């Protein structure tokens, strides 16, 4: 979600979120067992992001943070401005997800991150889990990039369902290092679910990927 620290590119939305934080807070408080919130950080605004971490993570109901790969808040995850924010989140034990994508021809935006760059960051915090959003898009390359960094998990959404993706991820990483993502509302939930449901893996592995792994990261106990 967005909490008014310049992540949307819409001044009116940003002003609304800053002036009426209850718009975000009330749904999380009403359905704490159904809504487990994460919010985007903006490394271009260090003070604002640090304040948001304190307000929404340390003192609030959020459970994790997301570093975007595009838009006004995008900063490559190896940038020095990202590190103090990661350190603050790690101290709180919260989930960290980083948008990652490999593009044909290389990066097209200054703030984009790749799985290899996330692996570089994650090596500095070997006891803290990081989620590699979208498995880098080009998932074969993405899986290989983070394979040797055991505290990095891949997330499944954002690219077309392709035979062999989940099977390779389970084979190379283990089912415990894969978390399901829907990418709603811009992707089809059925398509995203089919990546896991139709995969040639065990039912136990499917349960881990479809929810148990992420619940473990969040510290949610049934």
Give the predicted meaning of each segment:
Residues 181-189:
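Short glycine/proline-rich, acidic loop/turn segments that cap or connect secondary-structure elements
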Residues 7-104:
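Active-site gating/metal-coordination segments in enzymes
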Residues 60-64, 76-179:
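Catalytic pocket-lining loop regions of alpha/beta-barrel enzymes
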Residues 24, 56, 65, 89, ...:
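Conserved, mostly hydrophobic/aromatic
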Residues 174-177, 190-222:
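Mid-to-C-terminal alpha-helical segments outside catalytic/metal-binding sites
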Residues 3-5, 43, 69-71, 102-104, ...:
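Active-site-proximal loop/turn and secondary-structure-junction residues that shape catalytic pockets
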Residues 1-2, 40, 131-133, 155-156, ...:
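Short beta-strand segments
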Residues 18-22, 112-115, 190:
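Short, surface-exposed alpha-helical segments at coil->helix boundaries
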């Amino acid at each position: 979600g967005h909490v008014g620290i310049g992540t949307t590119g819409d001044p009116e939305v940003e002003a609304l979120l800053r002036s009426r934080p209850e718009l975000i807070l009330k749904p999380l408080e009403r359905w704490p067992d159904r809504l487990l919130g994460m919010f985007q950080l903006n490394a271009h605004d260090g003070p604002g992001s640090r304040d948001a971490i304190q307000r929404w993570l340390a003192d609030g109901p959020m459970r994790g943070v997301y570093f975007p790969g595009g838009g006004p808040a995008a900063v490559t995850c190896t940038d020095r401005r990202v590190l103090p924010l990661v350190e603050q989140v790690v101290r709180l034990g919260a989930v960290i997800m980083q948008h990652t994508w490999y593009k044909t021809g290389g990066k097209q935006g200054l703030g984009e991150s790749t799985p290899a760059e996330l692996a570089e960051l994650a090596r500095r915090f070997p006891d803290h889990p990081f989620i590699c959003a979208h498995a880098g898009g080009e998932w074969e390359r993405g899986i290989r990039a983070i394979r040797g960094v055991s505290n990095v998990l891949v997330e499944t959404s954002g690219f077309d369902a392709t035979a062999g993706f989940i099977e390779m991820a389970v084979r190379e990483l283990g089912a415990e290092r894969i978390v399901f993502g829907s990418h709603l509302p811009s992707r089809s939930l059925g398509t995203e679910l089919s990546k896991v449901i139709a995969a040639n893996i065990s039912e136990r592995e499917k349960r881990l990927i479809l929810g148990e792994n992420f619940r473990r990261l969040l510290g949610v106990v049934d």
